[in-house]
Amino acid sequence: MVYEGNENYRMELTSLRARMDPCWYYYNGVSTFSSMAYEKVSNMQYHLGMFGNYINSYTYHRQTPVYNAFFALDYIVDNDQGSTAQMNEHYYERLFSKGKFTAYKNNYTLPVAFRANEEIKYWSHDNSNPFEVQSGLFE
């Protein structure tokens, strides 16, 4: 398959080997581990449902369509052979499979940059329920 689109896209694997897979494999992902990462961003990602240490890392695992849209994840590559989870065909279009990898196109993503109304500054992510945090982000 040859990709014929904008080279500025974000993707993630469903099962990472390390928290730095985007860096190791040179792709634009959301997972990160860095001593330079802002703790507040790590806190926010944790409250949004990402796995992390709440200090300087957060790791992508299968997420909700809301999270994937908000963080502009254009492609999800399912490489978790042990999982029975299915990608919902309403949200994701199966592109191709090769070996243990199956690539999906996210049908609903927001652009990498977009404008929100002024009320976003009152949004709080201090909640232990990631579904409520994600819902509050879109209200």
Model region roles, listed by residue range:
Residues 24-27, 35-42, 67, 127, ...:
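Low-complexity, intrinsically disordered regions enriched in charged/polar residues
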Residues 32-70:
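Luminal/periplasmic acceptor-recognition loop/helix of membrane-associated glycosyltransferases
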Residues 67, 72, 77-139:
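Flexible, solvent-exposed extracytoplasmic
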Residues 28-31, 49-53, 112-123:
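Charged, low-complexity surface segments at secondary-structure and domain boundaries
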Residues 2-6, 45-52, 108:
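Generic secondary-structure transition motif, activating predominantly at the C-termini of alpha-helices
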Residues 13, 57-60, 84-89:
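Short amphipathic alpha-helical surface micro-motifs
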Residues 2-39, 104:
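Short periplasmic/luminal acceptor-recognition loop of GT-C membrane glycosyltransferases, typified by
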